[in-house]
Amino acid sequence: HLDFFKDLDDIIHSFHEFCLRTPKDGLVVVNADDANAMRAAQGVDREILTFGTVETADVRPADISTKNGYYSFTVMVHGEPYTKVTLAVPGRHNMLNALAACTVSWYLKLDGARVGEGLSAFTGSSRRFQKLGNLPNGALVVDDYAHHPSEMRATLAAAREMNFDRVLCAFQPHTYTRTKALFPEFVDALKLCDIAILAPIYAAREKNTIGIESSDLAAAVPNAKFFQSFAEIADFLRAEAKPGDLVLTMGAGNIDTVGHMLTDGASQ
């Protein structure tokens, strides 16, 4: 939310202040893989537990294996096994999410076996790599809410691990100010697609007073396309997607409409 925070230091300071609101007898859980999260927790006089893949983390994964982007691992707490997890949601970022959940579960003295069973049974939430269906030729259609470059990279990296022939991503940027402020980061993230298809920017609460358009992103990303309407995007994807491809709609606006047009046979 760069329309509110001045810069990264301002964001870190805000999270530091948030940590200080934790009750004195409470717990602060921090991602040890994220240097900025660790900065936010510096000087916080509360009990702190860290999770991540770095050796210094209190809660770490061991015996990691992956199959088509889905992670299995043993959760270690202070070097001792707590539980085993085989995730039904893809991506390294979801392994980190599971470690965060295990950190809190261990602190609350929950039974490790049941925690592992619960995490392994979790199949995801709406608009987070949500499978919408398939095109007639079998290409999978998935929707994801990612709209910040770091989220986009995590989702696209997960898609890359899933052994699709190609990743075709229809992305709807969210707000003009964010698109302008993070333009280079959006370009880098979209380069992870085989084909990026850009929809017009979702304005939300804004008016375009800074002269930025989705077509600017499309011009900066190799092999990217820009279309003015969802109908044009859906038509392009129907013609372009092949068996073995992933069609991914991405954004925090209403880009999921395209996914439903492809899988429900709707025309909008």
Which residues does each PLM region occupy?
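A short, aliphatic-rich alpha-helical micro-motif
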Residues: 19, 190-191, 241
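Glycine-rich phosphate-binding loop signature in dinucleotide/nucleotide-binding domains
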Residues: 108, 159-165, 240-245
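Acidic, Mg2+-coordinating active-site environments of NTP-dependent enzymes
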Residues: 1-141, 164, 215-219
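A glycine-rich beta-strand to alpha-helix segment
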Residues: 232-263
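Short glycine-centered segments of the SAM/dcSAM-binding site in methyltransferase folds
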Residues: 27, 195, 246
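Structural beta-sheet core signal
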Residues: 30, 50, 169-171, 198, ...
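Glycine/threonine-rich flexible loop motifs
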Residues: 2-9, 178-180, 206-209, 257-259
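Active-site beta-alpha connecting loops in nucleotide-dependent enzymes
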Residues: 125, 145, 150-226
